[in-house]
Regions:
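The structured alpha-helical core of multi-pass membrane proteins
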Residues: 2-663
Length: 663
């Protein structure tokens, strides 16, 4: 007998309309929308002399980078590579992990690690640059303390959720982009020839002739760092809303970049002393522009923090990261808060600000890690296109073209390594090591779980239930079954029921958890193995769904009771006459690794690191969403390749030898 619950609500795709487009502006484009704050300033500080050919070439590079990277790769191609409406590098990997290429997970964890590392510096550089605009009004203003204060507030409010203020993000970002476009267009009128930058000839000439081309490309790349976040936010807004909004956003961005370029050419002698973004603002609007820039930086930071929580939540369900405590501060679908990650990010951002002190130095650390993320996304997109039967020639051209483009950007950004890029690469390297060790250790743990055919034990389980000489352990006894074979059961689970302390119960429940490739699936199958005694419940959980076994099992039980397929009333007469249901108790089998159980040094080292990493997570009962007052954890050793004992450790002494020794 099998029963199946209805799937959870599918991904919430907003319909195309003004409201949907407005929400998209507030959620998706914060990162890429704040890039005009620092891109042109970074280009001017590469050391290249300011001339018309240099500025036209740099602007042409910006326009065509936005076109090739953001428009074609992400909006036209990547947004179509959705996993039931969800996007991002881990959602893309979830579509591909069943392929024959078992090493493909490396691309996903490299990309996720560098994306998370880059996220540490984004709030620092955007907020710092915005506050630095105040120096044009008050040169002695303490930028660092103000920046740290704003950053502290941003991270502090995460615990309360951002539902109330989040609704206004879209309106604010609409005003922000209009400000960018209008001010930029006004500045263009002072140097109309700046429009020649649309011609890619100027980009080609700059790259061919400038000795500082790699430094300029490293600065230009900052204009598209938010493209990966655009893909990750696909599930929040839908492809059409993002694509339509991008047309507006791109236009406003290009107008602003061109306006900054026009100002630079009109003020070539003094351009290095100012930030072109604030310089093109009319003096009467400067303070307003600084307030708007600070607000946009806050929106970008908020989107990035929320994105980090979502990425790590996905990583947990894909077994890339240890389970951590997740809170839901509001009723908004998908809004998460991970306290430990919030604290770690806050400390990281504060250290970045204190280490680099100003946005010019932060620019040197920015962009290197995200280039690697984009390269990994390109490779995964290539596998995706191939798996969907896209023409081989198109797939090869796509992968080849973008691997070359991103390899060039990576080479250019490597010039930033000693100047600050080492920081994000170090963070990314640590995160990659943690994910890699976690994946390998989980494989080892699964490999050494011994299983047995469950149907061989039906009779003994029935006999234990009927044997009233055994004290009743619980009315309903629930185990999480870690066997990954159909019809099999973890042998330590059987040992717990039968050998360790025979556990008599009215009903035995075996919970099998299967994390599926789709994001929002939440289904179950329930099979009665022994009528009115043993049940097997398989929960199919999407990679964006948080496991909450107690809640899900309650629904399963209620469904079965409603259908008259199980009687959960207490068997004790004094309780049954009042309609009181039987109690539930959960048994968790926790395997403890002992280095002595293996003579493989490499494996011992890996499992030792795994043990350290697991300390940042929560224990299995909390990870599964169980009521800890109803849980018993039984610890058993994880035996791995125990070395064969060739010689007896303890010698048997016969009676004659004993008597002789006593004499």
């Amino acid at each position: 007998m099998k029963e199946k619950a209805e799937s959870s609500v599918a991904c919430n795709h907003h319909k195309v309309g003004f409201l949907g487009l407005l929400v998209t502006l507030g959620i998706v484009f914060g990162d890429i929308g704040t890039s005009p704050l620092y891109v042109m300033k970074a280009i001017l500080h590469t050391g290249e002399s300011i001339s018309e050919s240099t500025i036209l070439g740099a602007l042409s590079c910006i326009i065509w980078t936005l076109t090739l990277q953001t428009t074609i790769k992400y909006v036209c191609v990547a947004l179509r590579a959705d996993n039931n409406g969800e996007g991002g590098i881990l959602a893309l990997y979830a579509l591909l992990r069943r392929l024959k290429y078992k090493w493909i997970y490396l691309l996903a964890i490299i990309g996720a690690s560098t994306l998370l590392a880059d996220g540490i510096i984004t709030p620092a550089i955007t907020v710092t640059t915005a506050i630095e605009g105040l120096e044009s009004i008050s040169p002695n203003l303490p930028v660092i303390p103000i920046t740290l204060g704003i950053i502290t507030i941003i991270f502090f409010v995460q615990r309360f959720g951002t539902e109330s203020i989040g609704k206004s993000f879209g309106v604010f970002m609409l005003l922000w982009f209009l400000l960018l476009g209008v001010v930029g267009a006004f500045s263009i009128t002072s140097y109309p020839l700046i429009l020649k930058a649309f011609n890619p000839y100027y980009a080609a000439m700059l790259l061919a002739k400038s000795p500082e081309w790699f430094l300029i490309l490293g600065a230009v790349f900052l204009c598209t760092t938010g493209a990966e976040a655009l893909y990750s936010d696909l599930g929040h807004c839908g492809r059409k809303n993002i694509a339509i909004s991008w047309g507006f956003v791109k236009t406003m961005l290009i107008l602003n970049y061109l306006g900054q370029g026009a100002w630079v050419l009109n003020h070539a002698d003094t351009a290095l002393a100012a930030n072109p973004f604030f310089a093109i603002m009319p003096q009467s609007m400067l303070f307003f522009a600084i307030i708007m820039a600070t607000g946009a930086a806050i929106v970008a930071s908020q989107a990035l923090i929320s994105g980090t929580f979502s990425i790590l939540s996905e990583a947990m369900n894909l077994h890339f990261w240890p389970r951590m405590r997740i809170k839901h501060p509001t009723h908004v679908k998908g809004q998460l808060y991970i306290p430990m990650i919030n604290l770690a990010m806050y400390i990281g951002v504060v250290l970045i600000i204190l280490l680099f002190r100003d946005s010019s130095h932060m620019e040197a650390a920015y962009g290197l890690a995200i280039t690697i993320t984009m390269l990994m996304t390109t490779l995964l997109l290539g596998f995706y296109l191939h798996s969907k039967g896209v023409a081989r020639i198109f797939t090869m051209l796509f992968m080849g073209a973008y691997c070359i483009i991103e390899a060039i950007f990576l080479t250019a950004n490597l010039s930033k390594f000693l100047a600050g890029g080492w920081c994000t690469m170090l963070i990314g390297g640590i995160l990659f090591l943690m994910m890699y060790v976690w994946v390998k250790a989980m494989k080892i743990r699964r490999h050494y779980i011994s299983t047995k055919p469950l149907d061989d034990y039906y009779q003994i389980i029935s006999d234990i239930k009927a044997d009233e000489s055994i004290p009743k352990y619980a009315s309903n006894l629930v185990y999480v079954n870690h066997a990954n074979k159909e019809g099999a059961v973890d042998d330590k689970l059987l040992y717990s029921i039968i050998n360790k302390q025979p556990k008599r119960a009215d009903h035995y429940w075996l919970i099998n958890m299967e994390f599926v490739d789709t994001p929002d699936t939440l289904e179950y199958n329930c099979e009665t193995l022994i009528p009115d005694t043993l049940y097997s419940v398989t929960m199919h959980i999407g990679f964006r769904i948080e496991p909450r076994v107690s809640l899900y099992l309650r629904q399963v039980v209620e469904d079965l009771v409603a259908d008259g397929k199980v009687d959960l009333q207490s068997t004790y007469p004094s309780l049954r006459k009042y309609g009181i249901p039987g109690d539930f108790r959960f048994i968790i089998i926790h395997r403890v690794y002992y280095p002595e159980s293996s003579d493989n040094r490499q494996q011992n080292l890996l499992m030792s690191i795994y043990a350290l990493i697991s300390k940042i997570g929560i224990d299995e009962p909390k990870a599964l969403g169980l009521d800890t007052s109803m849980v018993v954890v039984e610890r058993v050793p994880l035996i791995i390749n125990h070395p064969v004992i060739k010689d007896k450790v303890i010698k048997v002494i016969n009676d004659s030898e004993t008597s002789q020794s006593r004499q």
